[in-house]
Design a protein with these regions (language model features):
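Short, solvent-exposed loop/turn positions at domain surfaces
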Residues: 42, 48, 65-68, 272
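Short, well-structured beta-strand-loop connectors
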Residues: 48-62, 80-81
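Short coil-to-beta-strand transition motifs
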Residues: 68-76
C-alpha cells in the first residue's frame, strides 16, 4: 500500500488553455538544436565542428567540469552551427536532420541484474546522464558522488502543466525499466498524485511509491524530498524528470538514444490546446505553427507559466520542458482605476476581488506583475503556499544579505528555485524569488567547491 502524504499549504492556479488529453500530431522539423542552458549548472565544451556528421546519440558537447558527462544529439545529420553569445558563451548547437535517421549503437542492459556502476557507465556513454539533477544546489549532478536516494516525481501540478499520464501511454515498459535501473544505484522514490490512476505509476516496481494529496506545489520534487528524506549538509540526492526516466528505459532496452517526448501546447493564446509528439530541441516555431490566435502581444514560455523561460519563435524546445505555453503579454492593456473595480475575472489570493466566490473558475491571466518591486513585507505569505519545513521569508532575507551560515541553518540545501514559484506569484513585494534562490545556490556552490 502506497504511503499517502497530505499537504494543506499551497495554491492551485486554474488558468484557461489547458491541453486536451489527446496527442494531436507528431511534429517533425528539418533542424534541431541542443541548448546548454537547459541543463542547469553545466559549463559546456563543444566537441563537434560545423560540417561534422553526427548520429542520434553522438555527443555535441560535454560538461567542462566533468568531461565524462556528455550531451547527445537528438537526431542524425550535419552540424550546421555552433551559436555563441557574449564572451563566447555557447547558446546552442544546431543539427540539420537527415531524412532517414541513424542511431549510434550502445549496449543494452539487463537492469534487473545490473550493478549501479553499469547503469551509470551506460548513461554516461550515451549522453543521458546530464538529465539527472541533484540536491543540494539543484544542478546537473556530479557522477563521482553517489546519492543517498533518488527521487522521481510523476505529479505535474503547476498551472497548465502537462499531465505525465498522457506521455506515459505506450511508454509504460520503458518507464518501469528506467525506474528499475535507477533503483540499482540507490533507493528510489516515486511521487505520484492522489488522482493519478495509471497502473505503471500506482503499481511501479522496485521503488517506493508515495502519494501526494494537496495543492500545487505538491508535485515539486523538492517538496517531496523534504517530506520523505530531507537533505542535510554533506548529503546528496538525485532527482530525475519522469520523461528522462523514459529516455533511460529506451536506452537500456534498445541500445539507442531516443529523445521523443510528448509535450503540451497550452495557454489561452493557443487555438486548440493539445499534446504533440516531438523531439528535444525542436524549434518552437514548428511546434506552434498555425496554433496561435495571434503572433502579437503574446508571451511564449518554454515550460509552464510559473517556472518556464521566456522565449520566442526562434528558440528551441528545452531538454527539460514538458510544455510550451502561450499567454497574453499584457503590454497592450490599459485599465482605468483597475484597483478599485469589482474585477470578477481577476484572480486574487487575498479576496480583494469577488472572483474568490467563483470556485473552479478558469482565469485568463497575462504576463504583467501589476506593480513594482518594493520593500519585503514579513506577512507569512510565503509560508501559506510553501509546504516545506523551512522558514521561507527568513531564508530569502539570508540569501539577499549573503549570510551563508544563516542560509545553511534555514535549510537552503533542501530547496530549488521552482519551490518558490507559487510564493513568487503571491508575493506582495513583487520580488524575483526564484532568481534570488538560484543566485544564493550558485554562491553556496562556489563556496563549497
Amino acid at each position: 500500500m502506497a504511503n499517502v502524504i497530505r499537504l494543506r499549504k499551497g495554491l492551485n492556479i486554474n488558468l484557461k488553455g489547458r491541453a486536451s488529453e489527446q496527442v494531436s500530431k507528431t511534429v517533425v522539423s528539418g533542424e534541431y538544436a541542443l541548448v546548454p542552458d537547459g541543463f542547469v549548472g553545466v559549463t559546456p565544451k563543444v566537441v563537434v565542428h560545423e560540417g561534422d556528421y553526427v548520429k542520434a546519440g553522438d555527443a555535441l558537447f560535454v560538461n567542462k567540469h566533468y568531461p565524462d558527462v556528455k550531451f547527445s544529439s537528438p537526431v542524425s545529420g550535419q552540424v550546421v552551427a555552433v551559436e555563441r553569445g557574449e564572451r563566447r558563451k555557447v547558446l546552442c548547437v544546431k543539427v540539420k536532420a537527415e531524412d532517414e535517421q541513424h542511431y549510434q549503437s550502445f549496449d543494452t542492459l539487463d537492469v534487473k541484474a545490473a550493478e549501479g556502476s553499469q547503469v551509470i557507465d551506460l548513461l554516461l556513454k550515451a549522453g543521458l546522464f546530464g538529465y539527472i539533477n541533484q540536491l543540494p544546489y539543484a544542478v546537473s549532478t556530479n557522477p563521482t558522488v553517489m546519492p543517498k536516494a533518488i527521487f522521481v516525481s510523476a505529479l505535474r501540478d503547476m498551472p497548465l502543466a502537462a499531465d505525465f499520464e498522457v506521455e506515459l501511454k505506450g511508454n509504460e515498459e520503458a518507464f518501469q525499466t528506467g525506474l528499475t535501473a535507477l533503483s540499482r544505484i540507490a533507493k528510489t522514490y516515486l511521487g505520484i498524485g492522489a488522482k493519478q490512476q495509471a497502473a505503471a505509476l500506482v503499481n511501479a516496481k522496485n521503488v517506493e511509491v508515495n502519494v501526494f494529496d494537496g495543492p500545487c506545489p505538491a508535485g515539486n520534487v523538492g517538496v517531496q524530498v523534504n517530506h520523505i528524506n530531507p537533505v542535510n549538509k554533506g548529503e546528496v540526492v538525485w532527482t530525475v524528470n519522469p520523461s528522462a526516466v523514459i529516455f533511460f528505459g529506451r536506452l537500456f532496452m534498445t541500445g539507442k538514444v531516443d529523445l521523443t517526448r510528448t509535450v503540451a501546447v497550452a495557454g489561452s493564446m493557443v487555438k486548440e490546446p493539445s499534446y504533440v509528439s516531438t523531439l528535444v530541441g525542436t524549434p518552437l516555431s514548428v511546434i506552434l505553427d498555425s496554433k496561435l490566435t495571434t503572433n502579437e502581444h503574446v508571451r511564449i514560455i518554454n515550460g509552464n507559466p510559473l517556472t518556464g523561460v521566456k522565449s520566442s519563435l526562434n528558440d528551441f524546445l528545452s531538454p527539460c520542458a514538458s510544455e510550451v505555453t502561450v499567454i497574453p503579454e499584457g503590454d497592450n492593456v490599459n485599465e482605468i482605476l483597475g484597483w478599485i473595480m469589482p474585477r470578477f475575472g481577476q484572480f486574487s489570493t487575498s479576496k480583494s476581488y469577488f472572483s474568490w466566490l467563483c470556485k473552479g473558475k478558469e482565469y485568463d491571466l497575462d504576463a504583467r506583475i501589476k506593480g513594482g518591486e518594493r520593500h519585503m513585507i514579513m506577512s507569512g505569505e510565503y509560508d501559506k503556499v510553501l509546504p516545506m519545513d523551512i522558514y521561507a521569508e527568513y531564508l530569502i532575507k539570508a540569501i539577499i544579505t549573503g549570510d551563508i551560515d544563516r542560509q545553511e541553518q534555514l535549510g537552503i540545501y533542501e530547496v530549488s528555485p521552482e519551490d518558490f514559484a507559487v510564493a513568487e506569484f503571491v508575493d506582495s513585494s513583487k520580488l524575483e524569488l526564484q532568481r534570488i534562490v538560484r543566485d544564493g545556490l550558485n554562491v553556496l556552490r562556489k563556496e563549497n567547491a
